[in-house]
């Protein structure tokens, strides 16, 4: 988003229709990483920059994989990652931006890296391709998780790949009787395990089954 400074005032201009956006304010340490044609700008608080390189590689590989699969996102090739406090969400995606809570910078965890892959996918499914209504939320959530799932599929083989696919199936069926994909956003807390298993895992499974039926192309 272009920024102009006049008389000490910052003016942010968005040439495309969209929500106003979000701001993160703090005494950040800025570090920029390059992955192919993508520029990742990390803004972290002092003491939290030890995982920047690892997270940057995870995010950069995700961007490259999704670009090969889906083309470039409308949000451009610059991606800003900002650290926020622990009183908000663990992750929050905006056009060309990702907000990450401070607790995620304490140590590198596999679940955090998996989540980063999914959050990057929202630059395509939710930001580039919008939703017609709130009832379509499962499409964005499911496609983002499926995109991350397909990326992780390329990193394992043999028995590990079988276990990986079986885990997705088990998660998608765990709360089978709780709510449908369409009703989950209105009936369940989006931070609950049930919501995440249904919207993420079952949503991803729908697209995996579609791929298995029609083929990758």
Can you say where each PLM-predicted feature lies in the sequence?
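Extended, low-hydrophobicity, Ser/Thr/Pro/Gly-biased non-transmembrane segments
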Residues: 1-26
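Short, intrinsically disordered, charge-balanced linker/junction segments flanking boundaries
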Residues: 1-5, 211-217
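Juxtacatalytic substrate-recognition/specificity segment
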Residues: 11, 28-123, 127-137, 147, ...
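Alpha-helical scaffold segments in carbohydrate-active enzymes
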Residues: 14-19, 65, 143-150
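Acidic/polar loop patches that form or flank catalytic/metal-binding clefts of enzymes
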Residues: 72-79, 132-133, 155-164, 217
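Acidic/His/Gly-enriched intrinsically disordered linker/tail segments
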Residues: 90-91, 137, 141-205, 209-214
């Amino acid at each position: 988003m272009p920024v102009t400074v006049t008389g000490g005032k910052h003016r942010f201009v968005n040439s495309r229709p969209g929500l106003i956006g979000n701001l993160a304010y703090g005494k950040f340490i800025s570090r920029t990483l390059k992955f192919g044609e993508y520029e990742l700008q990390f803004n972290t608080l002092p003491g939290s920059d030890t995982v920047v390189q690892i997270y940057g590689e995870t995010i950069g590989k995700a961007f490259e994989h999704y670009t090969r699969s889906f083309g470039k996102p409308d949000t451009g090739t610059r991606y800003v990652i900002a650290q926020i406090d622990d009183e908000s969400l663990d992750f929050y995606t905006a056009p060309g931006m990702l907000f990450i809570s401070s607790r995620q910078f304490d140590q590198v965890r596999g679940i955090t890296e998996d989540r980063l892959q999914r959050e990057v996918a929202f630059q395509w499914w939710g930001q580039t391709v919008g939703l017609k209504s709130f009832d379509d939320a499962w499409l964005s959530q499911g496609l983002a998780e499926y995109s991350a799932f397909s990326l992780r599929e390329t990193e394992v083989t043999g028995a590990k790949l079988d276990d990986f696919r079986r885990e997705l199936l088990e998660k998608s069926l765990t709360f089978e009787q709780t709510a449908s994909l369409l009703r989950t956003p209105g009936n369940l807390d989006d931070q609950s395990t049930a919501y995440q298993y249904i919207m993420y895992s079952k949503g991803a499974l729908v697209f995996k089954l579609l791929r298995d039926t029609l083929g990758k192309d």
